[in-house]
């Protein structure tokens, strides 16, 4: 008997075991992220922490109470989240549980692009000045804090209303984080580039400035000409057309590829043939 091969197989089995558990936990977190179940999980973790501490310090009464809470709590979870559990099982049966999160993110990204395009085209035609910065991997919390926090679901109507002249939020930048308008009337750093045309105003200088220190995508609508400009990576792209803007936003902001058929759907398709 070759014990070396057995030990290698045992080692590989352990790796696969860990990867499968990690994958399942990751998918569960992705499924419940942004739902009320997240708050419930936080509460469960707190109870578990209290139980461990009470056991360590010998607090028998507290430990007994936490044991009862955990024992009956899981039953309560099944009852409270029965609709969510049913939907999750139905999703598993349809074979798209592993693509649900990616599809949702992709829809949000396309909604973001559509909202930016509609609002900028509307404002450009009416020469309403605007400055919209979309945060990506580099954190922009310092700049968000300089403005008025909104944390509002993004829409073209809301973006337009923010930049209507003589309204409290029109002066400054809108910063988008994720699929939300994080803040309005935020201050962005101005670029010191000597190559920036002097005919460009503060909005363009701020758009270029933020692109020099973050990986954000920033869109500017000129109130003088109605032209739409875009900055990224320390570069300024002036007077971009509607088609050019769409191509750039699609390339830079959509990170999820088109949904592919899952193993389950392939299996079902093969069985039906």
Swiss-Prot record:
It comes from Listeria monocytogenes serovar 1/2a (strain ATCC BAA-679 / EGD-e). Its EC number is 2.7.7.85. Disruption phenotype: Essential, it cannot be deleted. One of its GO terms (cellular component) is plasma membrane. Optimal activity at 0.5-1 mM CoCl(2), also functions with Mn(2+), for a construct missing residues 1-80. Its main location: membrane. Changing residue 202 to N: No c-di-AMP formation (construct without residues 1-80). This is Diadenylate cyclase. GO terms for biological process: cAMP biosynthetic process.
């Amino acid at each position: 008997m070759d014990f070396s091969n057995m030990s290698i197989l045992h080692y590989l089995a352990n790796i696969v075991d860990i990867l499968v558990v990690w994958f399942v936990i990751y998918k569960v977190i992705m499924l419940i992220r942004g739902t009320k179940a997240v708050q419930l999980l936080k509460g469960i973790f707190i109870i578990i922490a209290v139980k461990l501490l009470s056991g360590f310090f010998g607090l028998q009464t507290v430990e007994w109470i936490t044991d009862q809470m955990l024992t009956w709590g899981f039953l309560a979870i099944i009852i409270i989240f029965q609709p969510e559990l049913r939907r999750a099982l139905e999703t598993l049966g349809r074979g798209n549980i592993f693509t649900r999160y990616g599809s949702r993110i992709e829809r949000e990204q396309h909604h973001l692009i559509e909202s930016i395009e509609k609002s900028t085209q509307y404002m450009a035609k009416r020469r309403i000045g605007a400055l919209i910065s979309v945060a990506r991997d580099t954190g922009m919390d310092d700049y968000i804090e300089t403005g008025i926090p909104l944390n509002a679901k993004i829409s073209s109507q809301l973006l337009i209303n923010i930049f209507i002249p003589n309204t409290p939020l029109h002066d400054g930048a809108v910063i988008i984080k994720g699929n939300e308008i994080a803040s309005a009337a935020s201050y962005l750093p101005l670029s010191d580039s000597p190559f920036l045309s002097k005919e460009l105003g503060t909005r363009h200088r701020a758009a270029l400035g933020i692109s020099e220190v973050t990986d954000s995508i920033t869109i500017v609508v000129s109130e003088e000409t109605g032209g739409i400009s875009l900055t990224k990576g320390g570069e300024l792209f002036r007077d971009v057309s509607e088609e050019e803007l769409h191509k750039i936003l699609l390339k830079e902001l959509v990170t999820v590829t088109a949904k592919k058929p899952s193993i389950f759907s392939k299996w079902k398709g093969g069985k039906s043939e």
